[in-house]
Amino acid sequence: MDTQAFRRSLHHSDRYNRRGFDSPTKRAQALEEAYQSDLISSIRDNGFTYNKGRLNIKLAKAFGFCWGVERAVAMAYETRRHYPNENIWITNEIIHNPSVNDHLRKMNVKFISAKNGIKDFSLVSNGDVVILPAFGATVQEMKLLHEKGCHIIDTTCPWVSKVWHTVEKHKKHVFTSIIHGKFKHEETLATSSFAGKYLVVLDLEEANYISEYILGRGNRNEFMNKFAKACSDGFDPDKDLDRVGVANQTTMLKSETEEIGKVFEKTMLKKFGPENLNSHFLAFNTICDATEERQDAMFSLVDEDLDILVVIGGFNSSNTTHLQEIAITKNITSFHIDTPERISVEENSILHKPLGLDLELKNNFLPSGNINVGITSGASTPDKVVADVIEKLTVIAS
């Protein structure tokens, strides 16, 4: 499929909307009423610090809702107001935040069900309204919904769309897209649907493994078994890794994406020589500004004198998970929670998710004496949620 041509035609359809319905001023006011916090505003004004008794809280200098998330959430709410009586569906969680998604359910926005990773669009009918989430949707889903005669409200983050343009450029010039991401993640599924040949790479270890194969030091069967679910149909590592371009899931760790890009650039340089590098490697710039800002702020926060660190965000949120990884690299005791309800004031306990593990209950997690607590949150976490966490910590400390 010519994905560029399809997107152009979709954008000209009178059943497609990617701008929303409210003015920017009205949109900002609605979000402020729903999710902003006076406490968080005052903490920002106080140099991102908050002192209450024995508790000293230090907030990351960039955290919480990014503008892409704000835009998606606002457009979803606007859609219900604009279509008060129509069936409204959403193809996935609007963002990775349970409270926001629960609010949409209360507004009678229906979520497309999925079984074994396959979405069921059978209940979606002509004239229904369908919201595409901030992560985007696959081109196949867009085509299906367009053919069904649905009104499509596209809240895809522009940074995600930028990555789609990048992989389409790779396809046009017959380059394989190396996508730094998680192959099951909604954003990467969408991005790969716009690519030609592609290979999804999780981390630096996998990048180095592929590099070794490109340089002739690998086993084909082992390679294909390793990446069976992370590559395009008919992928041939002996042919499709001669010309590569790098792109990324926008929520991945910035420093790792850059390192992976360097691995493939050096590999192609070694195999084909400097005079042929541009024919075999395409440079990239698809790192999201908001992701970069939050990660940089987290690196600064973990350099502070902290006793514990609380990371707030959906458990399936990639950008939040990477913030937790930064804390772990500094050996700081950290707790990843998705809602304030994970903290029990009465028990001084926290039900948190260690990286890569199941939920775990930690009793007496807030120690006695003076304590320095670092706090950050993922790009899908409203300020009000962060404020509720701080208020619970304050009560425990008192």
From Swiss-Prot:
Annotated dimethylallyl diphosphate binding sites: 96, 185, 317-319, 380
Alphabetical list of HAMAP family matching this protein: IspH
Origin organism lineage: Bacteria, Bacillati, Cyanobacteriota, Cyanophyceae, Synechococcales
Entry keyword set: 4Fe-4S, Iron, Iron-sulfur, Isoprene biosynthesis, Metal-binding, Oxidoreductase
Designated name of the protein: 4-hydroxy-3-methylbut-2-enyl diphosphate reductase
Family per record: Belongs to the IspH family.
Binding-site residues for (2E)-4-hydroxy-3-methylbut-2-enyl diphosphate, renumbered to this chain: 96, 185, 250, 317-319, 380
UniProt cross-references to PANTHER family, sorted A to Z: 4-HYDROXY-3-METHYLBUT-2-ENYL DIPHOSPHATE REDUCTASE, CHLOROPLASTIC
Cofactor(s) for this UniProt protein: [4Fe-4S] cluster
Lineage top rank: taxon: Bacteria
Xref: InterPro entries: LytB/IspH
